């Protein structure tokens, strides 16, 4: 048996990828261990009570902060490692990668973010006091900032899910946090913009960053790949991720809100907004569905969360409970319409393959929330009696220029997302020379994971079931409206990544393989 040069090149480059991945990951981990040891430390003075009697020591205010902090830490921890991971398991042959990559990259980014956050805080301190600290305090806020940055990276990952190698994800996980904290440094530390739950810094920035990278990685074969489709079990697991994100989102938006009424409002407004977006999702999905007014699980998994995103900037502000529900309802409506009408046009006109639909879940709701924060700031400045004196000083840190500060921070978030995405996109294109996925490896675990015997092999069964379900609804003469006149014999990716097989005379064009054929296919495909 002979091998051509292309096969030899593919085998050679395939061996390079794990070497580069493991070496870079190992070196970067050693680098962070050294930096943590040399640059960070715990504050040992905050627990001092003035008493020399150890029996009187109970932790004081610090213990109260720890008790309050741990609940938020736990909830956000679940969101990042469980919620985002399982939300991406909808792809029928990509479950290992969705969970595994979110796991390792989130763990890495959580470490890297502590160092970057300490550096930019030290930079901000030097600008104000003229002295750059030699060591950085490792605090509870440091852990939260690590989670927030991990969330932004996971949002970006959603746009390129299925089309990247572990090395690609590692490079993006190293570079994106630099732009994330540069954005926070400009908007939070200098402009003092309002963004309690990361509507701008996490959702808007992360989604623009990911969509820009996706523009570089989108090609014709990725758009036509039939494995870019969900499975029944995958959708159920993804729905579990949605439910955990939905339940924990109030903690995400309230974690760093000022204590007292602002923190309570952040919890309440986020919850109410989530209920509004959930109701809107079921209404709009059922009303405008292209498949017989049936609910689409893609909408339920994603658009129901839009209420949490739209509250990211202003959850702690006095916006009225009815206003919170209305914002969630509007965000959910626009999100579903985005999946139905905007995403197909973006893919066709702009050539951006957005695997998870982050444009509709994070980008548009995040932008709406950022604009809402500008108007809420104007209203608050014109009606200062809406807040107590202490609340007003905590929320409107930029004073009379708060609205303009938020407008500038919104534009900066979009701009840095584009610039950072362009840089990473160019780098990932070059990395394809080391090991780029072949078209047959898109949206599959087989290239990088040891797989069990029941790993799904063919898409024909899913096509057949979809045809059987839709044929009942179109039996009354709706075939012309549903596009039966399309070219025969082609497997087409329908809207929302659903697989649609054109029909002819109520028979399937693609014959389902026999058990023996499936077994032969399994043996022939390299894992």
From Swiss-Prot:
Q: Which SUPFAM superfamilies match?
A: Ammonium transporter
Where is this protein localized, as stated in its record?
Answer: Contractile vacuole; Membrane
Keyword tags: Glycoprotein, Membrane, Transmembrane, Transmembrane helix, Transport, Vacuole
Biased composition annotated in UniProt, kind: Basic and acidic residues: 483-495
Q: Is-annotated flag, keyword Glycoprotein?
A: yes
Q: Name one GO cellular component term.
A: membrane
Residue spans, topological domain Extracellular: 40-70, 121-141, 188-195, 258-263, 320-321, 379-406
Q: How does it sit in the membrane?
A: Multi-pass membrane protein
Region Disordered: start-end pairs: 471-527
Give any Pfam family that matches: Ammonium_transp
Q: What happens when the gene is disrupted?
A: Does not appear to exhibit a phenotype related to osmoregulation perhaps due to functional redundancy with rhgB.
Which residues does the record list as glycosylated?
A: 47
State any single GO MF term: ammonium channel activity
Q: Report which superkingdom the organism of origin falls in.
A: Eukaryota
Domain remark text: Acidic motifs (DDEEE) in the C-terminal domain are necessary and sufficient for efficient transport to the contractile vacuole.
Q: How would you summarize the oligomeric state and partners of this protein?
A: Interacts with ap1g1.
Instruction: Tell me the protein's name.
Output: Rhesus-like glycoprotein A
Organism placement in taxonomy: Eukaryota, Amoebozoa, Evosea, Eumycetozoa, Dictyostelia
Recorded name of the encoding gene: rhgA
